């Protein structure tokens, strides 16, 4: 009887030790991928430099001021594999600036599938004094100009690169 109880207890301890061990689980896969949006935002600041030496016209644009912000907006509803219409999803916003040449680049989240999602780029307002030709044929500054940035739609997909340029 003692042997039977001892064997049962020993068997129970061994079974518990084997079944109680947990396998190390792998880290869960990311639920989102990424995509890159990049491009140039430019404007025509120097209205005098549009005439070439031979008298022909060529519009020459420059990068917008580096203080201008670019706000990229996505709806996180689009990132969910099985979105719940009754859930209030967050709006994702990423803000970047341009370099001196007007170039920007931003990495945004995408669904972890090949689905394309849509977003919006908003360029903040900025002001400048355009360079014009005076009556003495020299550079002079015109009155202040305020530029209001439009809202630009874009599309992205996992692993993709979207080029989005804009000229004022």
Regions found by a protein language model. Give the residues of each.
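Short, ordered, surface-exposed loop/turn motifs in non-cytosolic proteins
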Residues: 46-89
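Glycine-centered loop-to-beta-strand initiation motif
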Residues: 39, 97-109
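Bacterial Sec-dependent N-terminal signal peptides
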Residues: 5, 16-46
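Short beta-strand and strand-turn-strand segments in soluble, beta-rich domains
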Residues: 82-93, 144-148
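Short Pro-Gly-centered beta-turn/loop motif in secreted/extracellular proteins
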Residues: 105-119
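Bacterial N-terminal signal peptides that target proteins for export
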Residues: 1-9
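Structured interaction patches on ligand/partner-binding surfaces of diverse proteins
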Residues: 125-162
């Amino acid at each position: 009887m003692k042997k039977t109880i001892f064997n049962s207890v020993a068997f129970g301890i061994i079974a518990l030790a084997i079944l109680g061990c947990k396998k190390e689980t792998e880290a869960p896969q990311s639920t989102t991928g990424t995509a890159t949006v990049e491009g140039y935002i430019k404007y025509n600041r120097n209205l005098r430099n549009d005439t070439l030496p031979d008298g022909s016209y060529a519009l020459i644009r420059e990068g917008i001021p580096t203080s201008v912000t670019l706000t990229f907006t996505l709806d996180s509803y689009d990132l969910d594999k099985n979105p719940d219409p009754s859930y209030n999803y967050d709006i994702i916003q990423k803000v970047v600036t341009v370099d001196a040449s007007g170039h920007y680049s931003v990495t945004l989240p995408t669904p972890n599938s090949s689905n394309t999602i849509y977003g919006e780029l908003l360029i903040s307002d900025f002001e400048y004094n355009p360079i014009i030709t005076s009556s003495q044929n020299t550079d002079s500054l015109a009155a202040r100009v305020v530029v209001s940035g439009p809202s630009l739609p874009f599309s992205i997909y996992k692993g993709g690169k979207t080029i989005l340029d804009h000229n004022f």
